[in-house]
Amino acid sequence: MGDWMIENKVRDVVKKLKPYVPGKSKEEIARAYGIKPEDIIKLGSNENPWGPSPKIKEKILDEIDKIHQYPEPVNPILMKELSKFLNVDEENIIVGGDGADEIIDTIFRTFVDDGDEVIIPIPTFTQYRVSATIHNAKIKYAKYDKEKDFKLNVESVLNNITDKTKVIFLCTPNNPTGNIIENRDVERVINETDALVVIDHAYIEYAKKEYDWTQKAPEYDNVIVLRTFSKVFGLAGMRVGYGVANKKIIDYMMRVKPIFSLTRLSQVCAITALRDREFFERCVRDGIKSREMLYNGLKKFKDIKVYPSEANYLLVELKTMKAKEFCEELLKRGVIVRDCTSFDGLGDNYVRVSIGTFEEVERFLKILEEIIS
């Protein structure tokens, strides 16, 4: 049996699929460059540099003896804590494993048939395109205007709406540009279509509260807000995501969502993180402070342009170097940032820099001075 037989069985959309390119890990860089993992600064994956609540370790140890048992498909304690944290009813929440990616995939499995149209403004989170392609949807691209600091061109969204449009993705704050979408523009999109409007709020904790659509989502028939524990809660390795929408949307999605995708350990970590409000608030406060420190430091370099952000990362445009060369120079010195070449709608001279601890930001800025000078 030759490989050609496998080729004949693979779906055409998978053959053509341009896969998602994840950020590099400390372990990968340690192996490649001979640097100790503890000496590497990771500013490439939009993680919480202070990690999860210190109370989580004890709770994981308490749960270890139960991992031979299946988890609860819907954990009532987690739902209660989420409801309290978000100030929305439990019936308006859906929780999944694999971060918000599972919720995105569940949206496609619930609402999108072959050939249906989805609208994706670019540049944005690549997983929307990947999921749309896998589910054989027709992608129509809208845009963020670079000359306006990547403000959403709302007309480009509205002009792409047809009677075949099923889903519209609005990432706010947007990844990788960091900007929010103005409330009036979100509202225009919602009101001018009966398609499902997905408002991705993965980074909303770092933005001004007035831009948060979570509590408003259940009031609409065509809105779902995506949230995650991977960012400010420091649980990227536990893969917990959730959505908030009206009960009808949630009920249909629950029919197709994987049953046991959220592990016992993931559930107990999420519950503990929600209960440690003091640690959460400190991470938000310090994250914003780190972002400001990073932004002010980057603005001093004349050979780069840094864009304002409401997230936990900054988009940087390089004026004299390509992203690949720039990232390589940083990697040699033990610093990971994200090459944005793989993001649709950006060129090969953009990188994304995540927040770090205050010490990490200081060290990064000193290393950057070496490279640019």
UniProtKB/Swiss-Prot annotation:
Keyword Magnesium: no
Pfam family, one: Aminotran_1_2
Organism (species): Methanocaldococcus jannaschii (strain ATCC 43067 / DSM 2661 / JAL-1 / JCM 10045 / NBRC 100440)
Its EC number(s): 2.6.1.9
Single GO MF annotation: pyridoxal phosphate binding
Source species taxonomy: Archaea, Methanobacteriati, Methanobacteriota, Methanomada group, Methanococci
Catalyzed reaction equations: L-histidinol phosphate + 2-oxoglutarate = 3-(imidazol-4-yl)-2-oxopropyl phosphate + L-glutamate
Residues bearing the modification N6-(pyridoxal phosphate)lysine: K231
Protein name (Swiss-Prot/TrEMBL): Histidinol-phosphate aminotransferase
